[in-house]
């Protein structure tokens, strides 16, 4: 059993404003095997950008056939929503959350973990690249 790790992040300049998202997947030896930086939009919130980062990472993990995944992000809100500790109240986040839940069901073992920003540097770098 190989456990892969997905780090995700999002950023918004203005909140709402111009936003980018990033995600990176590491193999069980913590070697980067995939990464993505995406432009989210010109009127997006930070939380929408964070969910976008999560979704692009989850979609890729499913596409790669990953069965054991540790998901780490520095957004306490999103991690707690995915762990069902917080309800999703925002109408704009609800469809993103529901898609993330459905994608998570396609992975045999998935764990969501909050990490501090300093442990999420690569995904943060990618989310800022998504702004360009």
Q: Can you annotate each of these PLM segments?
A:
Residues 43-48, 52, 88-91:
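Residues at secondary-structure transition points
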Residues 11-15, 55-127, 131:
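RNase H catalytic domain
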